[in-house]
């Protein structure tokens, strides 16, 4: 894992300094394309002014040395540029006065803090104790009075007072400048007409803070420092086992059960790293956020190369490779057509280098990045393989339903076919979906029974309109059709094996139904359930016309927890009665007869489980319903 990241970092540091490589990108426009602005808090000896005139561009983050926030959830925030105003209204200036920048900068910062900030009380944590005196921007605003009124109603909760400050600050912006906080993408501190981030003393402190780690000390006389080597490059110089500067949590080093010999002083045996490799990792982590971060549904992930040979010499070569990887990934993530893929797919290999692709699913929490799943050494041809399998699966479904079907299986579509529990767009149950992606990308087998169980879980979400899932609750029949397409896709990818297909020449059903069964490769038991589902679909179509409503009472006969073998005969008899009741039995007698024959011949040796029974019943229901929908659309054209 770390080897690929260090390779990236080394290329980045070849032509640029570490501090330049720590600069984070920010959006320069809002969702409507309007440019964000820079809000400058301009402190001088006697005055505080706001400047809102500068528009952001791609160089703004470099100009103001934007490197994000200080490491750790409770770390003092002292950086002079930030994407939110909050810290500048409270703790930043106080924290700056606690850093030794040398004179005259120390004196300037102390003067600004003492003049322009109010002490709200010694009993308050330093993080929330101080507040910018907004009367310098609007004489009608009394911050101390605001705090007194707030604290009377919210005793002990000083953190929330920051929201009150923000609201008052925004009122000043609206009143004096006609702008809102949402119109700014970056906030910066100026001192005597210059951005604090341009002061050389400030830059040096940032660099020292970001890169310095505690040097490894021997824990006993027996331990020979010369025996320690960097786990990445083998160096014996400038070693550390302090990994706190890394944003991504590669190793657990805060729980005693993960320490060597269960000794808290022996975490160093898990991971020791030299300063050069640490710098490379820090540079690469910023690059991951800037260039290699993407989403798959509600899942966050990084995609990055691991060079087997031919490492990039510098950032320009690295950018070239990375752009090709990300562009190829984005196409198979949202595959609109295979033709598009064939036109846009990039040749991402050459004779001078060979690399594999790593997928790192992660979650950011409290400024730490925890790895949820690391899928390593994925071959480059995976993108072509996915596009080809998607094309084949779509062709199979189109042949099966004998209609044009403008849907492809891609990485994003898969996410919305497999039920995942979510809360406020945060994935809370992710093991199966990550297992699935790992097996898909590494060509490992996927268990069909478990997958069909997930399809049934999703069908239940749709039918019962359950909340808290990633599944779109619109169309059960199209969901089931797409699930069948996913099965064919996985067969083409090699993750699933196909079974023995029923000889449809022995069936008396309509030719279009025979065609569907043979094209989808259903066996006898699957076909029996499919035909039962077709009959349920036809009853549903009749009920839809009769009641002129989306509600189809026949679906109440289905148990969405699964249908076991003992309930199949009962369901078949109920379907027969409903065909009579709807007065459509004469149109579907052959279908019922074939279903009953296949059922009777296989019942003693029935192999399908309750979820598989329901899935193939729903597949038949889906087919009958979609054929009617498509026919209606064609007639209306």
Language model: regions and residue ranges:
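Extended alpha-helical scaffolding segments
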Residues: 1-185, 198, 240, 284, ...
């Amino acid at each position: 894992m770390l080897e690929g990241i260090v390779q990236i970092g080394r290329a980045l540091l070849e032509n640029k300094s570490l501090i330049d490589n720590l600069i984070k990108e920010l959006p320069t426009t809002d969702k409507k394309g309007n440019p964000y602005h820079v809000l400058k808090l301009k402190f001088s000896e006697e005055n505080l002014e706001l400047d809102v005139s500068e528009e952001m561009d791609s160089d703004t983050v470099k100009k103001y040395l934007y490197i994000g926030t200080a490491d750790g959830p409770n770390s003092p925030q002292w950086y002079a540029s930030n994407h939110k105003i909050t810290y500048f209204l409270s703790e930043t200036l106080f924290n700056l006065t606690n850093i030794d920048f040398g004179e005259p900068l120390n004196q300037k910062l102390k003067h600004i803090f003492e003049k322009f900030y109010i002490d709200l009380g010694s009993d308050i944590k330093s993080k929330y104790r101080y507040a910018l005196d907004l009367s310098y921007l609007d004489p009608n605003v009394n911050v101390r009075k605001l705090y007194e009124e707030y604290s009377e109603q919210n005793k002990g909760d000083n953190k929330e007072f920051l929201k009150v400050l923000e609201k008052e600050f925004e009122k000043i912006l609206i009143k004096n400048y006609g702008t809102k906080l949402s119109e700014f993408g970056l906030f910066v501190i100026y001192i005597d007409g210059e951005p604090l981030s341009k002061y050389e003393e400030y830059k040096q402190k940032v660099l020292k803070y970001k890169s310095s780690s505690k040097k490894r000390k021997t824990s006993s006389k027996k331990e020979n420092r010369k025996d320690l080597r960097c786990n990445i490059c083998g160096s014996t110089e400038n070693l550390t086992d302090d990994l706190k500067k890394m944003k991504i949590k590669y190793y657990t080093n805060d729980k005693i059960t993960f320490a060597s010999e269960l000794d808290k002083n022996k975490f160093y045996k898990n991971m020791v790293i030299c300063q050069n490799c640490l710098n490379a990792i820090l540079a690469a982590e910023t690059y991951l956020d800037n260039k290699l971060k993407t989403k798959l549904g509600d899942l966050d992930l990084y995609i990055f190369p691991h060079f087997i040979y031919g490492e990039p010499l510098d950032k320009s070569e690295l950018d070239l490779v990375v752009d090709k990887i990300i562009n190829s990934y984005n196409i198979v993530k949202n595959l609109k057509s295979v033709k598009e893929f064939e036109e846009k797919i990039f040749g991402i290999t050459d004779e001078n280098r060979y690399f594999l692709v790593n997928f790192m699913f992660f979650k950011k929490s409290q400024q730490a990045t925890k790895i949820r799943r690391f899928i390593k050494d994925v071959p480059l041809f995976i993108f072509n393989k996915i596009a080809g399998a998607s094309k084949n699966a779509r062709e199979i479904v189109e042949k099966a339903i004998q209609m044009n079907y403008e849907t492809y299986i891609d990485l994003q579509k898969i996410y919305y076919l497999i039920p995942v529990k979510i809360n406020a767009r945060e994935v809370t149950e992710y093991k199966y979906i990550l297992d699935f992606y790992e097996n898909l990308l590494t060509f490992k087998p996927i268990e069909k029974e478990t997958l069909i169980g997930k399809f049934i879980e999703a069908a239940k979400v749709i039918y019962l309109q359950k909340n808290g899932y990633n599944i779109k609750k619109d169309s059960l029949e199209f969901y089931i059709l797409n699930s069948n397409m996913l099965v064919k896709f996985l067969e083409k990818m090699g993750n699933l094996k196909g079974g023995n297909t029923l000889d449809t020449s022995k069936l008396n059903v309509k030719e279009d139904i025979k065609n569907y069964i043979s094209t989808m490769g259903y066996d006898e038991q699957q076909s029996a359930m499919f035909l039962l589902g077709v009959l349920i679909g036809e009853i549903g179509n009749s009920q839809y016309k009769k009641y002129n409503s989306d509600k189809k009472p026949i679906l109440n006969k289905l148990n969405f927890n699964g249908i076991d073998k003992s309930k199949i005969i009962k369901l078949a008899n109920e379907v027969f009665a409903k065909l009579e009741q709807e007065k459509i039995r004469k149109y579907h007698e052959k279908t019922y007869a074939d279903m009953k024959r296949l059922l009777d011949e296989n019942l003693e040796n029935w192999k399908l489980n309750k979820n598989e029974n329901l899935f193939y019943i729903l597949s038949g229901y889906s087919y009958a319903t979609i054929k009617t929908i498509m026919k209606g659309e064609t007639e209306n054209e």
